[in-house]
């Protein structure tokens, strides 16, 4: 039978991608259905109990800037907050939080259940209803049919998932959850390129069996950071430390002596695992010269005795896992409460997607998360938000939207996936972005909140706070520009106390702040420049904008140049052997990829800026230089 009520958008899957997709669609006013196999696992943290990190924290801030959920949830659930790379420049600073799994899940579920236009229904999905190359609904395992104008698939590792522990394996979506086999078979019938990937998780340890007294502690930052632009530290629950131990030669001997029992090294697992989160057996073999690896013992929650040993993801047999754990300092008597495992699953080539994350071959069908070949909660959530908002726009007969590479890390993520594809689980890093100085955590709202408002994602409260912040920044910068001090001033000694080189000419507040030895708090502590802003976010923006103004202007010039490249079209039938000066490697790659524009060509691995310059000169000489409108 068909469900009595029609929907505009159906989201299949209630993980990090699915919850953001459902929230985005519902916030935009579309009647949205979230189908999940288990309502109790909405927002489940399937692997590590943490949000954020290098590149990942940037994505969380971008989700928040557009009204998304993840940052608000982790502010309510985080039990240790830190700023990574705090001693480096603002472009690469990143927020990370350990999270209480239960509190995080509760925060997500509460938000979903209180979101207007959103219906949650518990049933696994076995089939899609496709008519004339257009998806029009979904069918659950009990045969119940739902109709919708768009469907978002956020099925994580569940598509034909297979769990491996040693040489044994069984079907599963993750530990304790069934796989989605009928839906995987249905998707393989569609004209889509499918392959397999693998990821893994470490064993969980009973905290009561660890000797923490011999381990180094790691505490969070004080004052505590927050993730959401609307958040504050008073929302955080009680805080907990992490602990650090290390593998050793005994650990590595155990692993090397049992590689024949590893499903990866025995050839049982065919899927490729994440390069930047390798298993402990991979670490030992790939970095054979290292006799130790750092392992972080991370609490899973305020009321849980489970510890997540970050750094020993493994699919070795349980008896080997037991030996590995007990070989490390402080863990000599440790007990495993959940074994580590690897999981293989289907993913679909993201080059078959539009930048809106709509499938090129099945109209109205959107993919987000691990189904696109990514790894990580944050990458999934960001894609989910984008897919959800574009599904809502399609349902409303509006054009889709996708951020550019210079606008957001989400733009980098989507462009990398849709242009280059991936053969291994894709993880976000700041190094993937060309315009890191523009794509900072601290300015995610300045980049995206106005766009989110135009799209219908940002509510009145966030919009009002955003405009107050903008006004504060501009007024404060103008105030500093209007305050001058000259070498004859009686206040000169106060100012010179901050400077490495005494003031020799008249200067205003911004010029003083631009000096590397002067920070905003010091400057506004001087009577002449007091009082400073009490809004810490606005004050941070004033300092960064002033200090990095020249660098930001240069990067903006680069962006404008790159935008010209994006609009410079390449002939579809061009044989790059004709272009004098290109290396054989570059010619082969360009002929293989057939990029549609100079911008796309520039992002192909191995295509250098010099090659792009040669290509532009050749196009101009041949009279083939064309730009899109």
UniProtKB/Swiss-Prot annotation:
It holds the Pfam family SAM_GIDA_C. Gene3D superfamilies: FAD/NAD(P)-binding domain, GidA associated domain, C-terminal subdomain, tRNA uridine 5-carboxymethylaminomethyl modification enzyme MnmG/GidA. Transmembrane segments: none annotated. NAD(+) binds at residues 273-287. GO terms for biological process: tRNA methylation; tRNA wobble uridine modification. GO terms for cellular component: cytosol. It comes from the Bacteria. Its cofactor is FAD. Keywords: Cytoplasm, FAD, Flavoprotein, NAD, tRNA processing. NAD-binding protein involved in the addition of a carboxymethylaminomethyl (cmnm) group at the wobble position (U34) of certain tRNAs, forming tRNA-cmnm(5)s(2)U34. Belongs to the MnmG family. NCBIfam families: mnmG_gidA. HAMAP family: MnmG_GidA. PANTHER family: GLUCOSE INHIBITED DIVISION PROTEIN A, PROTEIN MTO1 HOMOLOG, MITOCHONDRIAL. This is tRNA uridine 5-carboxymethylaminomethyl modification enzyme MnmG.
């Amino acid at each position: 039978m068909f469900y009595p009520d029609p929907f505009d958008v159906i989201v299949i899957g209630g993980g990090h991608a699915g919850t953001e997709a459902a929230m985005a669609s519902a916030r935009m006013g579309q009647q949205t259905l979230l189908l999940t196999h288990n309502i109790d696992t909405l927002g489940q943290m399937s692997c590590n109990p943490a949000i954020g990190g290098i590149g990942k924290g940037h994505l969380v801030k971008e989700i928040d800037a557009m009204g998304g959920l993840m940052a608000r949830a982790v502010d309510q659930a985080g039990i240790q907050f830190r700023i990574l790379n705090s001693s480096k420049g603002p472009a690469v600073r990143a927020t990370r939080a350990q999270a209480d799994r239960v509190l995080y899940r509760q925060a997500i579920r509460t938000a979903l259940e209180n979101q207007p236009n959103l219906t949650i229904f518990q049933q696994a999905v076995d089939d899609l209803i496709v008519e004339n190359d257009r998806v029009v609904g979904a069918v659950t395992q009990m045969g119940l049919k739902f109709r919708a104008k768009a469907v978002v698939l956020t099925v994580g590792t569940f598509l034909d998932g297979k769990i491996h522990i040693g040489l044994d394996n069984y079907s599963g979506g993750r530990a304790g959850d069934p796989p989605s086999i009928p839906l995987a078979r249905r998707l393989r019938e569609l004209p889509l390129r499918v392959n397999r990937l693998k990821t893994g998780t470490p064993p969980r340890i009973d905290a009561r069996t660890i000797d923490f007294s011999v381990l180094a502690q790691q505490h969070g930052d004080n004052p505590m950071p927050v993730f959401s632009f609307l958040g504050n530290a008073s929302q955080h629950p009680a805080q907990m430390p992490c602990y650090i131990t290390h593998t050793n030669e005994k650990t590595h001997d155990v692993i090397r002596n049992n590689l024949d029992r590893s499903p990866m090294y025995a050839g049982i697992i065919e899927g490729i695992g994440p390069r930047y989160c390798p298993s402990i057996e991979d670490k030992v073999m790939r970095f054979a010269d290292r006799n130790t690896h750092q392992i972080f013992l991370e609490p899973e929650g305020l009321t849980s005795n489970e510890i997540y040993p970050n750094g020993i993801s493994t699919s070795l047999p349980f008896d080997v896992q037991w030996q590995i754990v007990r070989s490390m300092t402080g863990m000599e008597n440790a007990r495993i409460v959940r074994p580590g495992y690897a999981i293989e699953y289907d993913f679909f080539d993201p080059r078959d997607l539009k930048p809106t994350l709509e499938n090129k071959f099945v109209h109205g069908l959107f993919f987000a998360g691990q189904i696109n070949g990514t790894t990580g909660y944050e990458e999934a959530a960001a894609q989910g938000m984008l897919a959800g908002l574009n599904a809502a726009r399609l349902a409303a007969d509006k054009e889709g939207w996708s951020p550019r590479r210079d606008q957001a890390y989400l733009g980098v993520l989507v462009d990398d996936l849709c242009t280059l594809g991936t053969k291994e689980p894709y993880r976000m890093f700041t190094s993937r972005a060309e315009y890191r100085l523009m794509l900072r955590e601290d300015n995610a709202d300045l980049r995206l909140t106005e766009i989110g408002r135009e799209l219908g994602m940002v509510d009145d409260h966030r919009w009002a706070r955003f405009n107050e912040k903008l006004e504060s920044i501009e007024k404060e910068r103008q105030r500093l520009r209007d305050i001058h001090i000259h070498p004859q001033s009686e206040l000169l000694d106060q100012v010179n106390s901050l400077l490495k080189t005494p003031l020799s000419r008249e200067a205003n507040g911004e010029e003083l702040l631009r000096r590397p030895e002067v920070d905003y708090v010091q400057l506004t502590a001087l009577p002449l420049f007091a009082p400073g802003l009490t809004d810490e976010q606005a004050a941070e923006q004033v300092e960064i904008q002033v200090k990095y103004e020249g660098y930001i202007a240069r990067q903006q010039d680069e962006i404008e140049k790159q935008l010209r490249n994006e609009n410079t079209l390449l002939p579809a039938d061009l044989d790059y052997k004709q272009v004098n000066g290109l290396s054989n490697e570059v010619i082969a790659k360009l002929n293989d990829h057939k990029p549609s524009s100079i911008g796309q060509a520039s992002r192909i691995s191995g295509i250098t800026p010099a090659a792009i310059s040669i290509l532009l000169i050749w196009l101009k000489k041949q009279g083939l230089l064309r730009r899109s409108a």
